[in-house]
Design a protein with these regions (language model features):
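Cytosolic-side transmembrane helix boundary signature
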Residues: 111-143
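Aromatic-anchored segments of alpha-helical transmembrane domains
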Residues: 27-33, 77-90, 147-148
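Membrane-helix interface "capping/anchor" motifs
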Residues: 60-74
Length: 855
């Protein structure tokens, strides 16, 4: 029973705790009511106003009748209201994955404050041996135990063995990677698939770290440089090649990680300041097949002249070469065996990529994805610093002879003749769409495939030409021999959202009406999966033109009234489904009711009409979902030819795009005394507007959109069916204000990095904002294995075979702008012991009488 004795010994502290909690509840209620009133005014939910008034009323009642339980009854009504409202909204969103996080954020702070207040009141107003006290203690203990049980049940764990025979029947050919991995995507087809199956679903639980390598290159020389190597190692012959954020190249022993040689191009620091991230996604490998006993190069074409340059210093003809591109505009040829510069390439071993570019600042345009080797050519695109100026450096793509370094062709949206040489003093057209990602090629078709970005200013295009719009956010097929355009497919018409092509095009065969055709699949930031005929660009699966919003169009700009949508495959830009996700107030989230309400206010103030909401100069801007990260990005897609599955990881993270009239933009662009790291507003010079486009985060530095913020999904390429999808990543290494929660509960984080698919029935991936590498069963999505990484794994996973053993490798160097832990590691895994099957998955037979060695 509740005592009327106000001076019961030892109870005063509980009384003060009760009053303190009710005071906090009152402050919380005041904030909720104030924000809630504004939300109602803006056309949103009444919940925050109603709950806030209840909490304020209960707090005032506690001050007036502090010895009575009536305030707790009012608080209890607020809790019940919150619970009902939460379930109604969460159910209205169809119980999205990670809905438990949504529920916890809605209820958590209110329940904790009310619970502590109620506990303190009971201990204040009841005798020491009261049954009410015992009941309260029991309830608290039971609640904590239940919470711990729920956390334990939802703790991410690998399930171990999936099936007795993990290897799938491979339909692979030499088009897929085997013991070697000679390109970013395994081969120039970009499948990120390996025929190796020694590691499979039946034994992946036994995968252990075999070795790791530290380059020492993880501390930028300046604070204005953002490191993220994003490197996928290349395996060719008996060497593994990797490069770092500052473009140091290392050749390693594939079995031990021992450094066989290293090369430091000594990149000037000022050339890295203009980069979004200082990255070296891959080196390029070329083998001209001239050396006796060496394999032929992947990609010699008879119609490309094979002219060998002068013999380089070092006693070798550089028949096998590794190429690295640097931010200061050098394409350097290195002997793959010895690591010295191949002097017969270009000028003393170097091709000057700044030639014809008219750069105003070092690094303004540079290659960060590596060259693609095909047809005896090195095909080189480049990133151009986003949103600096309309007359930014050209987006030209150039092809050089891999032996001599001679320029063979140069493709640009505004240069129809790719064979034309520049006149003395002439430069390539400024501001044209660039190709910053990994280029694919199919030598059987004689084509290279370019995924393009935008012209010099992403979010206003009133002064773009029709040709620039045609080749923006497009897949362009060019002739390998001449560089001439064969076909182009625009994925976003008149792109004003920075939905450039990030993912590498993927090539494979499909059967259409009983006829096998070479297809190209392109994943986009907007979430579409387009399947095109690789020879003609014709859509092989339905693509329809959907009407898109036109209201709020910026003066002088032009928008397309429709946008292409792939309707055969699910959209992978938000919650996976047949159409792009549309959010409303129910999807807005916060760690507490206060930041959640603030995010709701922002949502209702901003323009949002779904995908392709036009950029606006409205005071609060517009919500961009998917954001500039995507959707699908530079990690690329994985393709399993046996199971006919495309594996895609993607982010679900919104940005705010706020256009600023030129008079309000003080920042200077790169090339005119400006520096990208110093810009709060991207200047967009040469247009009427600057642009601010931060991620949409709350005051706790977490997204204003309820999780999941990242997924991995498998789609059948023949039927279009979404086979499985699941959130990718936990909150273990992230949290409010960037403080790790150490909760390994799947919520789905933003992710950058590529999958690896193997004929062992496995999909390996890191990419998420927690520092883990994972292996999923490709057929089902079940998590079978995971391992902790020493830093962020924002890179592509690869695999290779060496001396009878399969290895799985991931670069763990983190991503400065993604706020994952930085490092300098390459981590390599393999099966332990001598019982491993051979590289194709068959168990290795021991000789009769063979003995196990060691313990």
């Amino acid at each position: 029973m509740i005592s009327e004795n106000r001076e019961m010994p030892g109870h005063q502290a509980w009384g003060w705790l009760y009053l303190f909690c009710t005071g906090l509840i009152g402050l919380l209620g005041t904030a909720m009511a104030a924000l809630g009133g504004y939300i109602v005014f803006l056309g949103g939910t009444f919940y925050y106003l109603a709950a806030g008034l209840l909490l304020v009323g209960g707090a005032l009642l506690a001050l007036w009748r502090r010895h009575h339980a009536a305030p707790l009854v009012v608080f209890g009504i607020a809790v019940v209201l919150t619970l009902i409202w939460s379930f109604v909204e969460i159910a209205g969103k169809k119980w999205m994955p990670a809905w438990g996080f949504d529920l916890a954020s809605r209820l958590g702070l209110i329940v904790v404050l009310v619970g502590v207040a109620g506990f303190a009141f009971l201990f204040w107003r009841t005798p020491a041996r009261s049954s009410l006290r015992r009941g309260a203690v029991t309830a608290v203990v039971a609640s904590v135990a239940a919470l711990a049980l729920l956390v334990g049940l939802h703790w991410e764990r690998a399930e171990g063995q999936a099936s007795a025979n993990g290897a799938t029947a491979s339909t692979s050919t030499t088009l897929d990677a085997g013991r070697d991995w000679q390109a970013y995507g395994g081969t120039t087809l970009g499948r990120r698939y390996s025929q190796l199956s020694q590691v499979n679903t039946g034994n992946v639980r036994e995968l252990k770290k075999a070795w790791s390598f530290k380059s020492g290159d993880f501390t930028p020389r300046r604070e204005r440089i953002f490191y993220s190597s994003q490197n996928t190692p290349i395996k060719a012959g008996d060497m593994l090649y990797t490069c770092t954020s500052s473009n140091r190249v290392y050749a390693l022993d594939p079995a031990t990680g021992e450094v066989l040689w290293q090369f430091d191009p000594k990149v000037p620091a000022d050339s890295m300041e203009s980069l979004f991230s200082a990255a070296c996604r891959a080196v390029a490998y070329f083998d001209d097949g001239a050396a006796e006993g060496e394999p032929k190069a992947a990609g010699r074409m008879p119609d490309v002249p094979a002219v060998i340059g002068s013999i380089p210093r070092g006693g070798s003809n550089c028949h096998r070469r590794v190429f690295v591109a640097t931010p200061d505009g050098r394409l350097i040829a290195l002997d793959a065996v010895g690591g010295y510069v191949c002097r017969g390439f270009g000028t003393d071993g170097i091709v000057d990529l700044t030639a014809g570019m008219g750069l105003r600042s070092p690094g303004f345009a540079s290659n960060t994805s590596g060259a693609t080797v095909a047809g005896g050519l090195l095909i080189v695109g480049q990133q151009v610093s986003d949103n600096q100026r309309r007359d930014s450096p050209s987006g030209v793509v150039r092809a050089y002879d891999a032996r001599t370094g001679d320029l063979r062709w140069a493709w640009d949206a505004l240069r129809p003749d790719s064979q034309a040489q520049l006149a003395p003093g002439e430069i390539y057209p400024r501001g044209t769409p660039n190709v910053w990602n990994v280029i694919s090629a199919d030598e059987s078709l004689g084509l290279a495939f370019l995924g393009t970005g935008n012209s010099g200013a992403d979010h206003w295009g009133g002064n773009r030409t029709e040709a620039e719009d045609k080749f923006s956010a497009a897949v362009v097929a060019v002739d390998l021999a001449t560089g001439s355009t064969r076909w182009a497919f625009t994925t976003v018409q008149n792109d004003r959202w920075d939905y450039d092509i990030g993912a590498q095009p993927v090539l494979f065969d499909v059967e259409i009406d009983g006829v096998s055709r070479r297809a190209l699949m392109q994943g986009t930031k907007a979430g579409d999966l387009f399947l095109l005929d690789a020879a003609t660009g014709e859509p092989l699966r339905p693509v329809v033109q959907r009407p898109v919003p036109q209201t709020g169009k910026l003066p002088g700009d032009r928008l397309s009234p429709t946008q292409p949508q792939s309707t055969f495959y699910p959209n992978l830009g938000g919650m996976p489904g047949p159409n792009p996700e549309i959010i409303d107030g129910r999807h807005i989230w916060g760690v507490t009711p206060i930041d959640a309400a603030m995010c709701r206010v922002e949502f209702h103030q901003r323009r949002y009409e779904g995908l392709f909401t036009p950029p606006t100069v409205d005071a609060k801007g517009m919500v961009l979902l998917p954001g500039t990260v995507g959707g699908m990005n530079w990690g690329g897609l994985g393709f399993d030819p046996a199971q006919r599955l495309i594996i895609a990881n993607y982010s679900r993270l919104p940005n705010i795009v706020d256009m600023k009239p030129r008079v309000d933009v003080k920042e200077r662009p790169v090339g005119s005394g400006g520096a990208r790291p110093d810009q709060a507003i991207a200047p967009h010079s040469g247009t009427p507007y600057g642009v601010s486009r931060p991620m949409w985060l709350s005051l706790f530095n977490v997204p204003c959109l309820a999780p999941p913020w990242g997924f991995i999904a498998a789609t059948n390429v023949d039927t279009g069916e979404l086979i499985w999808s699941k959130p990718l990543g936990t909150g273990y290494d992230t949290g409010p204000f960037g403080i790790p929660t150490r909760l390994k509960i799947v919520m789905g984080t933003p992710n950058l990095g590529g999958p690896l698919v193997t004929s062992g029935g496995l999909t390996f991936i890191s990419a998420a904002q927690d520092n883990f590498i994972r292996a999923f069963e490709t057929a089902t999505g079940r998590l079978l294995w995971e391992s902790r990484l020493p830093a962020g794994g924002q890179a592509g996973v690869m695999t290779y075979g060496h001396e009878g053993k399969q290895y799985v490798a991931i670069t763990a160097t983190g991503h400065a702008r993604f706020e994952t832990k930085l490092g300098d590691h390459l981590v390599v895994f393999a099966l332990e012991g001598s019982d491993a099957p051979d590289l194709t998955g068959s168990p290795t037979k021991k000789p009769i009488g063979a003995q196990k060695q060691g313990p």
